Amino acid sequence: MLTVISPAKRLDWDVATPAGATLPEFQDEAMALVDVARELDVADLRKLMGLSEKLAVLNLDRFASFAEQADTETARPAALAFAGDTYTGLEARSLSDDEMAYAQDHLRILSGLYGVLRPLDLIQAYRLEMGSRLATPRGKTLYDWWGDRIATALNRAAEATDGRLLVNCASQEYFGAVDLSALSVPVVTPVFLEDRDGTTKTVSFFAKKARGAMARFIVQNRVRNLDGLRDFETGGYRFVPDQSTETAPVFVRPYPEAAPAARELAS
C-alpha cells in the first residue's frame, strides 16, 4: 500500500537531519523550475500565488539562493520540514527509526517544485503551489510541466513495495497532478466528516489533520488492505459503511465543540 499526502506552505527548519537522508528523484526537474521562477519579479510572484509583498520577497530570495546540489546545511528532510495541519496529524518527528524506514518506502509527498518526495528526501526552502499558473516550456501550468511523470514515479514506488493500492490523502489541488490514465494501481480516497446535530460536513482544518493522521496510522500499523484502513479511529473517527464506497471510505466523528469557529470552513 502506497500513501500520498500534500506538502505544506509553512516550513520548520529547526530540525536535525537524521542519518539516511536521500535526494529527490526529480532534482533536475526542480532545478529547471527554479530557473523559470528566477525570471519572475516580486509583482509576478505576488500574482502567481496571492502572496504578500513580504512573502514574495522571501520566496524570490529562496529561488535566488537555491543550490543545484542540496546538502544537510542548506536542506532538510521533507516530512520533518513541512509544517501544517497535515503534518500535525502525521507527527513525523515522533516516528521511530523503523517506522520512518517503512514510511520512506510507503509514503510519498506530492510537490509543485519536486514532483514526488520521499519522507527523508532533502528539500531546500521554497514555496511553489501545484495550482500555480507558472508558464514553462511544457505549458501554462505545473500540471502541464509534470505531465505523467508523477504517476509514473508512483507506479515505480508501488511496484517496489508490492503495493496494490494507492491511498490518496492529498488535496484535490495536488492529486490533480497525478495522471490517472498513466497510474497502474487503484486509488482509494478517504473522506473525513464532522457530525454536528446529525448533519455531516467536511471541515478543511480537521480533514487536513485527519489525512496526516491516516498516513501515520498506515505507517505504524503496516496497513496493507482496505480492511486494515477501515480500522482507523484516530481522533475519534469511525468508519461508516453505509456512507462509504470501495474507493471512498467515509470516516465520521462528533464535531469537536472546542474547535475555533474561524476554522469552520468546508473544503
UniProtKB/Swiss-Prot annotation:
One annotated GO biological process: response to hydroperoxide
One GO CC term on file: cytosol
Residues making up the signal peptide according to the UniProt record: none
InterPro entries referenced in this protein's UniProt entry, alphabetically: YaaA
Xref: Pfam families: H2O2_YaaD (PF03883)
Alphabetized PANTHER family for the sequence: PEROXIDE STRESS RESISTANCE PROTEIN YAAA, PEROXIDE STRESS RESPONSE PROTEIN YAAA
Family classification: Belongs to the UPF0246 family.
HAMAP family listed in its UniProt record: UPF0246
Protein name, UniProt field: UPF0246 protein Dshi_3333
